[in-house]
Amino acid sequence: YPLIEDTLRHMDKEKLIEFGMNLGYNGCTQGAHIVRKIKRTENINVPWLFFLNIDSSYADLHSRYQAIFDQGKELGIYVYCLYTDGDPEKLLPLIEHNPDCAMILLCNSAAVTEDFAKAAESLNNMLIGVAYDDNTDTACLVLRDHRLLYSIYRMYTDTESDEILSGSYARFAEEMHCPFVAVLADPGCSASVRENVYKAVVGARVAQKYRTIPIDLFYDIERIGNIISPPSSIIGFKPDGSIYNIGSDGNPLEHNIFNESLRDCLLYTSDAA
């Protein structure tokens, strides 16, 4: 109850409802039905969510990337985790053009400006993930002033897990009024540290220890994928279009989304598995 009350106080209700419907119904119900059917009839492991690292330097992002979303929805994918090293504001028209999808836009805190927040106000299908660094509190304040849906995330290494395990990272997220607090292991992170972090994440979540919901962006996505259609597939696309398997330390594969259809890329990935 404290989490719900806090979220409704600081974030727009319509954004919470629309993002939640896209995630829960389009992504995990309607989309999941399509994912399971394709697995059953074509033996293709379709992910329920995938990561897309976008090169925002292109003048016409719509013509370059919209086909990926169109193909994804045909396969039952309605949840996307987007990232760019450039200006995230340039990705907003793509998000607007796919109102039936739940879009998670990962941003560096320095990229969260007043102009960005104002441009994002009209979008109800997006959650903004702010990177955890020295400027995160300022970025969260900007987003909160515009009543946008946001949370924070951090990538951790073997030497950077203490804040997560001690709970100080989650307590910071509480102070920032985040409904979610996410972690993601660096590809070089050891299996033992990853497991300890995930145990801490699940333990805190089950105990409702904080006024925020801890999430592990790898293990929880994998877990949901295994519920929808096992074995779970966790993949992403780099700015050049090459596909990589997040479950294999981000190793690139031979196939490219700009040279082949998404269905073919996933078919080859399923065959490789």
Language model region names:
Residues 54, 79, 135-229, 234-240:
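Conserved C-terminal portion of the radical SAM core fold
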Residues 268-273:
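Conserved small/polar residues in nucleotide/adenosyl-binding loops
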Residues 65, 90-92:
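Leucine-rich repeat
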Residues 64-69, 165-169:
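Short, acidic/polar
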Residues 237-262:
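Long, low-complexity regulatory tails in eukaryotic proteins
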Residues 49-60, 72-89, 98-137, 143, ...:
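Core AdoMet radical
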Residues 1-53, 74:
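N-terminal [4Fe-4S]-dependent radical SAM core
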